[in-house]
Regions:
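Short beta-strand micro-motifs within the conserved protein kinase catalytic domain, predominantly
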Residues: 127-138
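Short cysteine-rich clusters marking metal-coordination/redox-active sites
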Residues: 4-7, 18-21
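AlphaC helix of the eukaryotic protein kinase fold
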Residues: 83-119
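Conserved N-lobe loop of protein kinases adjacent to the ATP-binding glycine-rich P-loop
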Residues: 62-71, 76-83
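Protein kinase glycine-rich loop
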Residues: 47-55, 59
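Cys/His-rich microdomains that often coordinate metals
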Residues: 10-11, 25
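A short, low-complexity linker immediately N-terminal to eukaryotic Hanks-type protein kinase catalytic domains
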Residues: 28-47
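Flexible N-lobe loop architecture of eukaryotic-like protein kinase catalytic domains
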Residues: 52, 111, 120-124
């Protein structure tokens, strides 16, 4: 069995197109500055395809390999301050003012995620299970 990187459901090893969502890894394409499906962050989160890009974050479908639980993983990746080379994990931060603005935004992103993670009952807010600083950015 293998994991479909489009929906994080299990499927037979011999199957190329997911019977659950129609995702086909062989024909799938995405922007080169997104992380490649199958990338692991935080030592346990398997990233799938991008489900949303907005403003300063990229949202990937993912799987917590330790808990065998589907998750959504947000990555701080503001296009006006940073990029990523195809096939690389690390973010390239532009120089000058962009560097300072990127770092301020990253600090805010991680602090906010950390605060939400520790809320007892985050009504109307998606539950945050973990915060990871890796690849010169945050998740």
């Amino acid at each position: 069995m293998k994991l479909c990187l489009g929906c994080m459901e299990q499927m037979e090893d011999s199957v190329t197109t997911c019977p659950h969502c129609g995702f086909n890894e062989a024909t799938f394409t995405q922007e080169s500055y997104y992380l490649t499906p199958g990338t692991i962050v935080g030592g346990k989160y398997i990233l799938g395809k991008v489900v949303k890009y907005g403003g300063y974050t990229v949202t990937y479908i993912g799987m917590d390999a330790e808990k065998n639980q589907k998750v959504m993983i947000k990555e701080y990746l503001p296009s006006e301050f940073s990029t990523r080379s195809a096939g690389e994990k690390e973010v390239t931060i532009y120089s000058g003012d962009a560097l300072e603005l990127f770092n301020q935004g990253l600090t805010t992103f991680l602090n906010e995620a950390n605060r939400i993670q520790h809320l007892e009952d985050p009504k109307g807010i998606a539950k945050v299970y973990d915060c990871v600083a890796e690849n010169d950015t945050g998740y």
